[in-house]
Amino acid sequence: MVGWLSTETGFRAIGQTGAVTVETDDWERARPVHELPATVSTGATGRCRRLSVNAPVAADPEPSDTQTLTTTTSPTLTLRFSSAGAVTTDGDGATVSFQTPSPVSIGVSERVHRPEPLTVPPSPAGIATAVTAAGDRLPDGPERSFPALRPAVPRIEFDASATRDDDDTRPIQFTVPDELESVLVAAPLAYYLGASLTVGASRPRIEIPALEFSLPFTPLPAFASETAATLQRLVALDSAARRVEGERLDDAPLAALELTPDHVTAVEPSVRYATFLDADQPAATTWHRSTYVEPTIERARILPALLDQLSLVYPAEATAVSPQELLESALEDFFRGVVSVTPLAPELGVGVSHGWLADGAVVDAFKTTPAAYDNATERTDDAETLRLTIVSNDPEMDEELALAETYRNRTNAVSTEIEIHESLTTGELARVFERPQTYVHYVGHCEEAGLRCPDGHLSASSLSRSGARAFFLNACGSYREGETLVEKGSVAGAVTLDAVLNEQAATVGQAFGTLLAAGYSVRRALALARRRVPMGRDYAAVGDATVRITPSVGDAPLLVVEPRGDEFAIRYEVAPESGGTYRDPFTGRHRRRGAWQTTVVDRARLRSVLEGRGIPVEFDGSFRWSGELAADLRSQGL
């Protein structure tokens, strides 16, 4: 993960291996003109007269209308701009100048090697040992709250003969009952504290012996909500105290405790966290993710992926969903198949994103499995071009083929190839799913035997592998087929739990594709898209739905616009992240992702906000693109 900060004078990319700064004094956001390689993870597109980079660069030797500069240090920054740009270098950096404001695309990537796996016994104590070792790699200071500065967590491997080091002298001790569920729930907090996590206590407790500090917790199930609130508070206070170049957050949470960033950063982590843990202050942040885990050793093996994302962990508890709750009713339109799944409603904790790492199909959470995380780790995805395929095996749903134009227009920040197929046979469709590519969008019918084709049905279980990183099976009752695609090699996808109307399927498909192309994750794109139809809960995500098919070039925000007489209320919503920030375009202040405020603007200001931003807008309950909405408002005299 690379941290991408928008600063007062440009941008700063921060990674595990270093940082690089781009400075420009006249940057204006704009739709991309020059394609970036698909290997970039984030960046920005806009226009300027001049920009400089504080790292050595190499130029693409191939003559072209587009110039490419790439830093020779890590993280790797890629600049693409027209041949009219004049480049000067001095060995330590480069400056690009234009006679008039000109389009520039900036992308950043970083290749970080995951550490060697940790081998531990397949037991609660073994898992606790792995969590303890993972916490040793964190920075000492409050900058551990900045996601890009947290090193990758080592994978876990099991060996019953592996030995544990019981001679632990870490300043912070976290003891829990000798049961896997308590270890899993405690893991995110113990990891973030850099604590020694051990088993054997009758009730959970954090102790800092040198300070004679002790904090007891209530046993499960209350333990889960208590650890969640504690971790939220620690990250919020660390975020207020950290000093990451290019970022400045409000330190009001510290001031409320009569602390300053200087006081906090000057002491050892154990002293800092004893102070924070003892504080009577509620968690003041919207959390990004919670995962509900069935306590088995096989699922515990995936804990490093959850710690990498700093997901909260809760016990997997759920109740059956009644047909009434799913808004099932007599529907006059015809259904496109009848392969239904009886879903569960999980008992959700805090968070915007919810993952279900347990048996059963669920609503309001994405169903993930160990295979999804294994697939994400094993895939290299180092191709410089996104490869997308749209398949329509239902002539009455051909309107979704128009998504090809959306993908072309909205993924043009990066190099993209798109294929369109209609009425594929079972063999042809199998080859589509098996070949390596970024994404497959399937429209058609799903029945008990599989996805319907002109010559029969294709069952995902018959595939040798699933080569698509992500997918959307926009067909009735496609849940089981989607689960199988993940088991066969995909990372995540969108599916349906039951029969859906053609019209609603098309509406969700168009919105989902539009948002996915804008750099949204599978989970967030589906969560927003399904709000557009009354039976949206019939759509679900499987696998690690935090995956994106396109780089997030910018914040990947959603503008929510509400008319208020002659004025408009605007919210610039950026999805929460584990300690990440964004720069509010209205105030210029850095805010934690997931925190936003409403700004009231007049017509002229609204148009200026919308123009030059290729981002989705929720306006009067419908999704639009900002530039298109600006043109409509202008034509209406608004």
Language model features: what each stretch is:
Residues E110-S145, E226-G349:
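Mixed-charge (acidic/basic) macromolecular-recognition segments
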Residues S6-E8, Q16-T17, D25-D26, D92, ...:
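Acidic, contiguous N-terminal accessory segments
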Residues Y439-R524, L528:
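Catalytic cores of nucleophile-dependent amide-cleaving enzymes
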Residues A283-Y439:
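A domain-level signal for caspase-like cysteine endopeptidase catalytic cores
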Residues T175-E179, V391-P395, H421-L424, V443-H445, ...:
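Structural motif
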Residues G43-T73, T78-R80, T88-D90, R150-P304:
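Long, folded non-catalytic interaction modules
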